């Protein structure tokens, strides 16, 4: 089997083939026959719709559970059987989350041979494919998230990412290739893959039925509740990681792709719901990093470590995690900032002579110059909190001192509002003009900008703000 390969469409079909490459006679004879078009490359019609469906998977994940639900109407649910079904649900569910996912798909920790055998067994009891098939497909999902090479891309629809990718046939050539050398060299993975059908039948149906049958005589109840229905709920929980975790919640670490964090998804999936974190830090054995977040898979792996069954638990440094969080917060702030009116950018303001500024002010235009920037306050005069007389006294003058403490040391909000009224820059060597000229000459000027190219104006860093407040007349 090639080291970098794409998953087959069906876990059972691949296992039935023994996991080996099959070279057909047609492949040995180049150009002997034209290539057959895969059914997924043809449109769905009334005549061929049934060919697009994976009937084996439909039987396993839809038809059999329906049979179980129907039988549950007549089969009484005993308390011991119910408790056993719940316990085995968690056992097989952790076989997927702690075993298939975090151990084999992401190598986020190492396990002793007994633990590997246990996880391979109970993971098989979840009836979600062999370790090799499952982990290979999941690696493709991470490598090609939200693209056509993602085997269960949410971009194809929420229903498709949940169950459609299983019940509809997929062209294996379109699924992204991944590195699986480590899986091919793991004897437990290889053994389970070769004997997968036996593992599924025994661990999925026979074992839970034996426990309830030999334990308290409820053979058929064990078959229906701890077997069929328990498999259905484990599968649906896992499918929620592919669908719900890419649709519901927040994106505190990155929003380039669809993965999201949400407590509801975590509750449904044994802690796999903090998916945005997981896609950013996939080799971390944790999905939840806060003490209050629900992640029983993480807690179980930690307990195994204390028992000597697991070791080399991988964790990203808190510093790197926090950097990602801060960068995403900054990105969200930039998005909000881009929607606000910060006034005409300084570099786009026209440079005007002082005499022109004075003349326009004398001719009835309410212009005020503060720190070399001209502001038109005509429409604001009547709303000025300090009264009309106060603001009128600064029209046509340099009101820098007046605005920054000479009369009143204006608030940060006042500086922000003032920035939306600026209309020009005074010529004459003032600081703002020097800054503006340097911009035109492409000289390096201290100016922090966000990802959209907008200048970031921090509180107290407005161009009209004088660092040291000027002493007021009363204080003098």
UniProtKB/Swiss-Prot annotation:
Cited SMART domains: Cyt-b5 (SM01117)
GO cellular component, one term: endoplasmic reticulum membrane
Residues where Fe cation 1 binds: 101, 106, 138, 142, 278
Membrane topology recorded in Swiss-Prot or TrEMBL: Multi-pass membrane protein
Cystine crosslinks: none
Domain of life: Eukaryota
Keyword Protease: no
Motif (Histidine box-1): 101-106
Residue span of motif Histidine box-2: 138-142
Domain Cytochrome b5 heme-binding, residue spans: 349-427
Bias-annotated ranges (Basic and acidic residues): 22-35
Keyword Nucleotide-binding: no
Region Disordered, annotated ranges: 1-35
Cofactor: how and how many bound: Expected to bind 2 Fe(2+) ions per subunit.
Positions of Fe cation 2 binding: 141, 246, 275, 279
PANTHER family: ACYL-COA DESATURASE (PTHR11351), DESATURASE 1, ISOFORM A-RELATED (PTHR11351:SF31)
Swiss-Prot/TrEMBL domain comment: The histidine box domains are involved in binding the catalytic metal ions.
Protein name: Acyl-CoA desaturase
Gene coding for it: OLE1
């Amino acid at each position: 089997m090639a080291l970098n390969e794409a998953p087959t469409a069906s876990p059972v079909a691949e296992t039935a083939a023994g996991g080996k490459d099959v070279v057909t006679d047609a492949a040995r004879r180049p150009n002997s026959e034209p290539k057959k078009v895969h059914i997924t490359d043809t449109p769905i019609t009334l005549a061929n719709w049934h060919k697009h469906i994976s009937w084996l998977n439909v039987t396993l994940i839809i038809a059999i559970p329906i049979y179980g639900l129907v039988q549950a109407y007549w089969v009484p649910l005993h308390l011991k059987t119910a408790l056993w079904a719940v316990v085995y649900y968690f056992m097989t569910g952790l076989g997927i989350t702690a075993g298939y996912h975090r151990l084999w798909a992401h190598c986020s920790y190492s396990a002793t041979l007994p633990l590997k055998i246990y996880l391979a067994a109970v993971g098989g009891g979840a009836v979600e494919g062999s370790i090799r098939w499952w982990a290979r497909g999941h690696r493709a999902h991470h490598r090609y998230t939200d693209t056509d090479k993602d085997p269960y891309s949410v971009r194809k629809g929420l229903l498709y990412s949940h169950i459609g990718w299983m019940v509809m046939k997929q062209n294996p050539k379109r699924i992204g290739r991944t590195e699986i050398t480590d899986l091919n060299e793991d004897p437990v993975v290889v053994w389970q893959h070769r004997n997968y059908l036996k593992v599924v039948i025994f661990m999925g149906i026979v074992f839970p039925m034996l426990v309830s049958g030999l334990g308290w005589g409820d053979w058929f109840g064990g078959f229906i509740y701890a077997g069929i229905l328990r498999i259905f709920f484990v599968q649906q929980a896992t499918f929620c990681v592919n669908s719900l975790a890419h649709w519901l919640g927040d994106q505190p670490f990155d929003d380039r792709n669809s993965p999201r964090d949400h407590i509801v998804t975590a509750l449904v999936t044994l802690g796999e719901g903090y998916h945005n974190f997981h896609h950013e830090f996939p080799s971390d054995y944790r999905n939840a990093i806060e003490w209050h977040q629900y992640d029983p898979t993480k807690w179980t792996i930690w307990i195994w470590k204390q028992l000597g069954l697991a070791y080399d638990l991988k964790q990203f440094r808190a510093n790197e995690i926090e950097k990602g969080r801060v960068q995403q917060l900054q990105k969200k702030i930039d998005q909000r900032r881009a929607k606000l009116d910060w006034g005409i950018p300084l570099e786009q303001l026209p440079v005007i002579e002082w005499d022109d500024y004075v003349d326009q002010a004398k001719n009835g235009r309410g212009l005020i110059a503060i720190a070399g920037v001209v502001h038109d306050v005509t429409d604001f005069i009547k709303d000025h909190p300090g009264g009309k007389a106060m603001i009128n006294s600064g029209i046509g003058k340099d009101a820098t001192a007046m605005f920054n403490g000479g009369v009143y040391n204006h608030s940060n909000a006042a500086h922000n509002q003032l920035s939306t009224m600026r209309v020009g820059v005074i010529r004459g060597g003032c600081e703002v003009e020097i800054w503006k000229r340097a911009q035109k000459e492409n000289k390096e000027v201290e100016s922090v900008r966000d990802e959209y190219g907008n200048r970031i104006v921090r509180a107290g860093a407005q161009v009209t703000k004088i660092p040291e407040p000027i002493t007021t007349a009363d204080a003098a």
